[in-house]
């Protein structure tokens, strides 16, 4: 390198002001080296002759030290931006912070992180649906980014949706095992993807399991609208001896957690069926809570031995009937919610869905053709239901009100306390604005629920305060993974190189359970 050539070091993902600072230190080092060389030349050289500068061991050591300072400055600048300097740029992802609560309060219970994440099944990827994603869709890259994300957020229990069966067997099972997790996987036999629950084996061990096949589950007088092939998975995870010993306990009345996950019907006109599926979620959780009590707690009738959670992709927004039927009880459909579910009852699903493999693949497009007897929009401004359709809607509300169970969204009760700018932007439940950012659709579809008994004589239509929730359920929310509002997202959809590895964003709650 000639002495008059300027040295410039460009660090990927480093802010401009940080880059200037780094290059300034390099330039200063270069000038100092030039001055030393010039001095050596004046002392040793003869008039009319040029001599080479003498390179001493001290000079070499000095240059090496300056280079090390430069490398450290570059590395520190990247770390400050949440960028792993040891990771190739194409495997980077946007690292979101945890927003903490109760920081001044000591931890006295069992603390763990609970994640839900729709990872976008490789089997469902079609280039036309992800026109801006480029190489981000390639599994050999995407798998590494997803794995880096799991390592970074370091959750203790992970609920996953859209996990390819092939990838789970050949990749995820081994990779999670290396990280200290055990897991369970379930799918419908006609689908290439399913759901999974992973847990840190040093904290829990599985003592029971329940599988949910929505098409086979009865919902009183309400029949399935169509074949969906959707499934759910619920586990009983008992606290390990290590958990109890770390809390100074030999035993505890609290045994562990019940954790479920699912991926509900995706179809735009599937609101009625999704609402039925949400009834199945609560009904099956009630059954499982009682079964675990019989098998693990000698049928003592005390359901408080276990903390029940249910997480996943519900393909429903906070102002739609599937979500509201679980969280706002007694159920009463009105305004937009009533219009949308009423409209969905008028939609006629193709019989091709009944039994044909792949007919219902998520993101696969509608196999039904619009016609004169089909509604044009799943969210019309107005819908005039006929008598039969009105009766179907009323029956659904009655069905949910007959079940003494409800769900509480953890982000709904707590997120406004850490990120009020993105709590309830487009809803009155305090939920963040988005968890899905695809090319053609953006919104909130994913939730982490706490499930509990509901007294039909009580009114639980409004969102409770964080304090009331924590006191009543012995669950403390110590933090939430930050969810970006829509105005912070790019114009293009996800996944995208250097941003996110799925069209969904992971959601995580940092929880403390009082044992």
UniProtKB/Swiss-Prot annotation:
Keyword Cytoplasm in the entry? The reply is yes
Q: What is this protein called?
A: RNA exonuclease NGL2
Q: Name one GO cellular component term.
A: nucleus
Q: State the organism named in the record.
A: Saccharomyces cerevisiae (strain ATCC 204508 / S288c) (Baker's yeast)
Which miscellaneous remark does the UniProt record hold?
Present with 3570 molecules/cell in log phase SD medium.
In the Enzyme Commission scheme, what number(s) does this protein have?
Answer: 3.1.-.-
Stretches of Basic residues bias are at 40-52
Subcellular location, in the record's words?
Cytoplasm; Nucleus
* Region annotation Disordered: where it falls in the sequence: 1-54, 353-381
Under the heading Pfam families, the entry gives: Exo_endo_phos (PF03372)
Name the GO terms of the biological process aspect.
rRNA processing
Main localization (coarse): cytoplasm
Q: Basic and acidic residues compositional bias: what residue ranges?
A: 21-34, 369-381
């Amino acid at each position: 390198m000639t002495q008059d050539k300027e040295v410039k070091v460009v660090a990927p993902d480093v802010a401009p002001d940080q880059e200037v600072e780094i290059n300034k230190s390099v330039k200063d080092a270069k000038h100092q080296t030039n001055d030393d060389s010039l001095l050596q030349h004046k002392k040793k050289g003869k008039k009319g002759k040029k001599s080479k500068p003498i390179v001493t061991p001290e000079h070499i050591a000095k240059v090496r030290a300056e280079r090390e300072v430069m490398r450290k400055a570059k590395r520190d600048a990247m770390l400050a931006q949440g960028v792993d300097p040891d990771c190739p740029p194409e495997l980077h992802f946007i690292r979101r912070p945890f927003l903490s609560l109760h920081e001044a309060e000591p931890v006295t219970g069992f603390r763990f992180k609970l994640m839900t994440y729709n990872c976008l099944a490789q089997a469902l990827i079609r280039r036309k649906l992800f026109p801006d994603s480029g190489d981000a869709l390639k599994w050999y890259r995407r798998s590494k980014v997803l794995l880096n994300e799991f390592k970074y957020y370091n959750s203790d229990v992970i609920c996953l949706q859209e996990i390819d069966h092939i990838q789970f067997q050949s990749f995820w099972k081994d990779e999670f095992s290396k990280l200290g997790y055990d897991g369970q996987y379930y799918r419908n036999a006609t689908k290439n993807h399913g759901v999974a629950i992973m847990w840190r084996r040093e904290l829990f061990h599985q003592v029971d399991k329940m599988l949910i096949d929505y098409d086979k589950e009865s919902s009183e007088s309400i029949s399935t609208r169509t074949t969906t092939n959707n499934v759910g998975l619920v586990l009983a995870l008992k606290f390990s001896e290590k958990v109890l010993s770390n809390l100074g306990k030999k035993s505890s009345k609290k045994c562990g957690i019940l954790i479920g996950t699912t991926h509900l019907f995706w179809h735009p006109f599937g609101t009625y069926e999704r609402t039925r599926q949400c009834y199945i979620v609560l009904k099956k959780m009630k059954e499982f809570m009682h079964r675990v009590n019989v098998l693990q707690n000698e049928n003592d009738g005390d359901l408080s031995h276990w903390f029940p959670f249910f997480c996943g992709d519900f393909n429903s927004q906070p102002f739609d009937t599937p979500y509201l039927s679980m969280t706002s009880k007694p159920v009463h459909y009105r305004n937009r919610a009533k219009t949308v579910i009423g409209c969905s009852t008028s939609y006629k699903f193709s019989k091709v869905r009944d039994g044909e493999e792949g007919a219902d693949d998520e993101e696969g497009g509608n196999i039904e053709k619009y016609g004169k007897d089909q509604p044009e929009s799943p969210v019309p401004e107005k819908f005039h239901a006929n008598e039969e359709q009105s009766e179907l809607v009323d029956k659904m509300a009655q069905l949910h009100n007959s079940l003494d169970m409800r769900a509480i969204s953890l982000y709904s009760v707590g997120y406004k306390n850490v990120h009020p700018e993105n709590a309830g932007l487009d809803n009155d439940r305090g939920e963040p604005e988005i968890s899905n950012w695809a090319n053609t659709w953006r919104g909130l579809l994913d939730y982490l629920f706490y499930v509990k008994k509901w007294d039909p004589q009580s009114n639980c239509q409004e969102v409770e305060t964080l304090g009331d929730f924590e006191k009543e359920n012995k669950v403390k929310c110590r933090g939430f993974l930050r969810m970006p509002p829509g105005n912070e997202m790019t114009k293009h959809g996800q996944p995208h190189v250097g941003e996110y590895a799925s069209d969904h964003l992971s959601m995580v709650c940092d929880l403390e359970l009082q044992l």
